[in-house]
Amino acid sequence: MKIEEALAQYPKEDLTRTPTPLHFLPHLSEDFGLNFYLKRDDLTDLALGGDKPRKLEYEIAQAKAKGADYLVTCGSAQSNHARLTTAAARHLGLDVAVVLSHDQWHAIQGNLLTVYLMGARVEMIHTEDHWDLEEHALALCDELKAEGKKPHYIPV
């Protein structure tokens, strides 16, 4: 079975412009005597891209199939995953909440600023343990359900 056939059985939300290009790196290739290429997944079009939008295409399709109207995730204060989940939710008209670790060095800049600007509900908790973040995010899902929302938790 080809990978395309295996993936075709899962619902997918179109969030990326793919395939992304490969750029030949002539100087590095010359230095090592090998052909080096750089995969430009930063060009997927979703909030500075990367590999995470590819995963989110499947996660969000599952959420939509279940009727979700709210996405919930967690991560560090400068989480790329939180930024991309927020961007995807907003692109699709869904509400979004992110549970992020609060540390003494965080500032409202970079990914955290972007998440705020995109209108995510942001909850900061003091922890260095990812499982604390996930537990808080799952509790937030229960809270949102009690408010009549249909949240879907997206793991990191």
Language-model regions, residue ranges each:
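PLP-dependent amino-acid enzyme catalytic core
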Residues: 1-156
